[in-house]
Amino acid sequence: MTLQIIAGRSGTGKTTHLMDEVGEKIKQNSKTYIFIVPDQMTFQMETSFLNKENLAGMLGTQIFSFSRLAWKILQETGGLSKTFLSQTGIEMVIRKAALDQKDKLKIFSRATSRKGFYSELANLFKEMKQEEVSIEDMVQSATNLSTSVNNKVHDISLIYQKYEELLADKFLENEDYLRLLAEKIADSDYLNRTEIVIDGFTSFSKQELTVIGELMRKCDKVTVSLTLNVPEIQHGLDEYSMFKASTEAYYALLELAKLNGTQVEENKFFLENKRAKTESLAFLANTWGHNKFMSFKNEPQNLKIHQANNRRAEIEGIAREIRQLVLNGYRYRDIAILTRNLGDYDVLCETVMEAYNIPTFIDKKRAMAKHPFIEFIRSSLDAILFNWKYEPIFQAVKTEFFFDITEKSSLNRRKADILENYVLENGIQNKWKWEKEGDWVYRKIRGLSTNVLPQTDEEIHMQSIINEMRSLIVNPLATLELNLRKAKTGMEFALALYHYLEQVNAVERLESWRQRAEEQGYLELAREHEQAWSSISALLDEFVEVLGEETLDLDSFTEIIGTGLDALEFSLLPPSLDQVVLSDMENAKLLDMKVIFAIGMNDGVMPLRQKDKGIFSDQDRDALRAEDSKLKPSAKNNIGEEDLLAYKIISLPSDKLFLSYPAADEEGKVLSESNYLRKIKGQFNELNESVYLTDPSLLSDAEQSSYIRSKQATLGLLTSQLQMYKRGYTLSSVWWDAYNSYFENEKESIMAKQVLSSLYYENKTKPLQETTAKNLFGETIHASVSRMEKFFSCEFQHYAQYGLKLEERGHFQLQAVDMGEIFHGAMEWISAELKRNNLDWGNLTEEECKQMAKLAMTFLAPKIQHEILLSSKRMEYIQYKLLQIITRATTVLNEQAKSSAFRPVGLEVDFGLKGDIPPLKIPLQSDSELLLQGRIDRIDMAEQDDRTFLRIIDYKSSSHDLALTEVYYGLALQMLTYLDIVVTNAQKMIGKTAEPAGVLYFHMHNQYVQAEKELSDEAIAKELQKSSKMKGLILSDPVAVSLMDTTLEKGKASTIIPAEIKQNGELSARSRTATRAEFDKMRQFVRHKYQEAGNKILDGAVSINPYKLKERTPCQFCSFRSFCGFDPSLTSNQYRHLANEKAETILTKMDMEGGTQ
């Protein structure tokens, strides 16, 4: 029984010596030789043995990690009768333990709901077992420490004891295997006549040292290889050395041998670097970690440092280097890319390497949390926990597990979208609404629905789809909830979930996905679908095994299962025989690499700026270790570990070492280079830093040609170079050659044309063909005024809404348009009620106004937006506020009616083919016509002598005025159109001709009076009346004005209309008036605008041409902005800037352009 230690720096040939020595021994005897290496190194070591000629494969040699050796020995000697718990199972049990003890916890009671907390606890428990720290020892160590540490240890103790109780000596963790291994080594026949070789470790846990001690007693020989600086073990331990841990391991092994009475053979020390093939790489590896500064005098060979503009430029530069290396004879498997921050690079690397046709293996396990199956389970449980809220329900729906597996996915998705739209629009946010008896009724009505018509065929069809999809969700989910609510034990909860997955045919769906992925060549995706089911099956088995008999409630079950789901990861396929490996530096599984790219070498990353992580802070660990705790040291006391990690990287390649860093992140934030790079540049005076550029145009032709490395990747660069050429920059012949090369091959030519077409891209539309326009809009265009205003705002907006029939998804929320409908509906109802009872607006009392408003709101509230005003306390309050506005409006109209001779003769008057008034007909080109239809809020009439006047009142929920500029540009046609229609059809409406008296906006709002001093009730009433003044444009005729405000006196301004009388009886310039002739001109011009719009629509006008008037544009509230892609920074996308001119100028233009009908 002997111990031998092999020591030396990396690359000095320790592993090669051990393999050669074993190879020679195998030829001479029949012993078994067992190599023990770290878990992540077993595959690489096996590959090395298979490739070693003198070992004749692996006959007589076995490769194990400590855990795999434990499994082998326990299989032989007994001890595997207990169930093994995975990391997922451990975290679930820890969560159960924490939940059970939650009320007793002093410091972690809130942390029990924090994501990652149970993973941190699992790591701490793992460390305690590895370092053989009992919970009693920890409690003892914390006795004299701060309250904070004491409380932490108190909570950890409670959770740990409960955790151990739940395991009940029936389950094994990974660390338990090593404890059992140490106990069973003496009983193993397999270990008779064996020699053990331990390689690849920089340190050993207490548990591992215990196992090594038992191996010393049992086996013929134990050889341990350690990477360290030989002078340090000859001259004593350096507290700050990067080899501190391995030097401590060296002394610990010698102490073990002494305790066991094991003979120590003469140590073998290796000093010469045999791996590095160039003097510069050998010098860097040999001098790293020395306290004494040493510099390299010559120009370094095969050692490069690169700066990059950003991470993408860095990876693209590396991809070009790799392509060149392969051209020079290297294999992809000779090359590795290592980084400290893999999360910043993995997706980027995958994309870039694919573009450069570089096969790449990314050595990173991915969480399963985003797989549709895992998301389905989590969302289903959340839906039940949160009373069937919209978000979790449709997160589950979108995974497709509710769908009929025999139907096409695309059809099911369309049906699910229809259901989702219905749920959103109807505010279905709880279980009661989902399970309400009877079919859900579909009506294509939004806003106020006072007149319910029979359902159309389309509505009936949509309703059948909605209820079909509803039942696909409700049936299984309601069954799951019923079974979960009845469950008491872990077993019952697990069975409820399992039966739910059976009910939705989860296995069959995952299998169909797997088969389809395989058929399409996506083998990794196929494996993921396969693993998803096997992982959930294993998770439920473990849950039942450990917690099957435990009493649980629904909250505890979902929390524990949620912890398990968070811990699930996809297992990795081993790399193929020829791939570049991208790996995290700390977990890299590499041997015999020729080329290393160390990327992301930034300050704070290498060396890592240490932060507290885990249950104990660095301060906590230092305090506990000061009290003789055997926990691992804090990060700040492991200063040398960062230097050692860097040393592993720089000593790994035999041929070439590339070090690089980005100068900025994706957001442009400046990033500094690593101190290690500054140190290397200080050592190598002749080392010149190069730059990976995003734009190579500043380089020489020869340097630019190095950027052309693959057809797909070069296309992107070529496009950017040609863009610059279009802007007047010189283009190297290198890029013209590249351009021409794409058109020598038909397949590449197609790809190039698709990509390069972006050079000529303009965000412009082409006019529709005449037949297409007529098919979309009809030869007779039936249109509303607002539609025509939309056309003049932006032709494409009109096309999207009325041609393509696009519309926003409806939401169960009260919008401005809904409030407008309530106000219109209230005024219509009150007016109709007054007419029915032969009452006049001006004769109402204040109390009657309030009562009318209240009755109107009572009638309307259930009829707006699927009863939204009755849906919650918040909506009840909004209803109250709306009632206040309606009451105030009723009172103001009552007051105005007392001072006006005008009375309503029409309310909510429809004009159109089926209206009270015929449509306004506008002749168009090619014998087509435009028929205008719509609804007029209110038509007022007044008479004096033989003159009859008509005016239009429009109720608005926001402040409006009539701007002639907007009329001229077609943006505000409504009021003058309505006036034209009623004056034109006066004979039909009132049995006589009439004059236009004006158009006025009545603003319905809650009014407030601002005053610097206290006002009387009379003064307040006067101020409120002023704020209720209607805006618009009225006839500049004293008779008409006096009829509108019978109280208006000379020298005063009206409180009802926009008019002011001077002392001489004339209207002042501050009045908003127009003559009869001007009104006629405007009416004629408005008709001309409709004719212009109608002809343009039939001509196929669909330009993306939004206007800009002052700071206002239609894009501000446009539903289709993301669809049209309007971008003012593009020369092809510019606003139509509209001039805001004086009324006189506008009227002159109208007169000139108005035309005749």
Swiss-Prot record:
Its cofactor is Mg(2+); [4Fe-4S] cluster. Keywords: 4Fe-4S, ATP-binding, DNA damage, DNA repair, DNA-binding, Exonuclease, Helicase, Hydrolase, Iron, Iron-sulfur, Metal-binding, Nuclease, Nucleotide-binding. One of its GO terms (biological process) is double-strand break repair via homologous recombination. SUPFAM superfamilies: P-loop containing nucleoside triphosphate hydrolases. ATP binds at G8, R9, S10, G11, T12, G13, K14, T15. It is an enzyme of class 3 (hydrolase). One of its GO terms (molecular function) is metal ion binding. It holds the Pfam family ADDB_N. [4Fe-4S] cluster binds at C794, C1115, C1118, C1124. Its EC number is 3.1.-.-. Binds 1 [4Fe-4S] cluster. PROSITE patterns: UVRD_HELICASE_ATP_BIND (PS51198), UVRD_HELICASE_CTER (PS51217). PANTHER family: RECBCD ENZYME SUBUNIT RECC. The heterodimer acts as both an ATP-dependent DNA helicase and an ATP-dependent, dual-direction single-stranded exonuclease. Recognizes the chi site generating a DNA molecule suitable for the initiation of homologous recombination. The AddB subunit has 5' -> 3' nuclease activity but not helicase activity. Heterodimer of AddA and AddB. This is ATP-dependent helicase/deoxyribonuclease subunit B. It comes from Listeria monocytogenes serotype 4a (strain HCC23). The lineage of its organism: Bacteria, Bacillati, Bacillota, Bacilli, Bacillales.
